[in-house]
Amino acid sequence: MTVLGGLGAVFSRDLSRRDIYNGMMARHCYGTTGARIYLDITANKVRMGDVSNSSGPTNIWGCVHGTAPIEYIALFNRSRELRRFHPNAETRDMNRIKIIWSGATHQDRGRFMKWDGGLEMNSGVIMGAIPLNMYTAKYGIDVLGERHVTWRSITSGQEEGILIHINASDDTVIAFEAGPAKIKFNVGEVRSSNLRWDLGGLDQFVTASTLHTDDNTFDAEFDYIDDSPVEGEQAYWVRVVQTDFHRAWSSPIYIENKIRKNL
C-alpha cells in the first residue's frame, strides 16, 4: 500500500499569509491526492468557490495541467455527473484485462482492508502481469504462473489492481478471490463490456475492463454549457483522474438558477 499525504492549492492575490487565508475562506482552492496537479474551473466567468446568480444557461470552462496522462475529467452538479471528458482516447485491447479493487472497513483510523489473494484461469495463458498502484516491496505480485497470479494488497480507500496480458478464448473463465470478493467471469464478458461488483462495506468494489488509456496527454481544457431549466442552487465541481491513480477535486461553484417566467 502506498498512500501519500494530500495537497491543497489556493488561488491567492499575493504570496502572503493574509491573501492565502482570504483565498481559503473564499473557497478559491482545490485538493489533490499528493500530485502537483493544476486545476482551474469557472462557471459564467466566476471561479471555483464563488456564489453567483443566473437566469439562463451556465457556461462552464476548465483547465487541467496534470503530472501524468489524464484518464478522464468528470464534471458534476452536486452528485450528478454531467459530462466526462477523455483527453486521451480510450481503446479496447482484448488481450489486456485491468482489474481494480478498492474499499475500506470503516471511516476512522485503522480502516485498512486486506486484498491478499489471486486469480486463476481455467484455460489459456497469462503472458504477463503488472501491479497497479502498488509501489512498496511489501505489496505486489507474489507468484506469476501460466494460468494464475497471486498478490499482496491493502487499501484504505485508494484503488489498487492488476493488469494481466492474456492469450485466451472468450469461453475462458477467470476466478478472482481477494478480500471479500469471490468472483467468476468469462473473458468474453469483459471483452464486450466493463464489469463491476459492489461488495458493500465502505465503497468496497471490484471492476474489470479491457478499456485502456495509452496516450500521453497531460494537459487539457474543456467547455460545457448546462442549459438545464432546473430552478434553485446548483453546485458545479470537477474531479480529475490520472492514469497513475492520482486525483484532484475542485471546490464547488454555487449558481442560484432563477428561471425566467413568461408573462
What are these model-predicted stretches?
Residues M1-L263:
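C-terminal functional module detector
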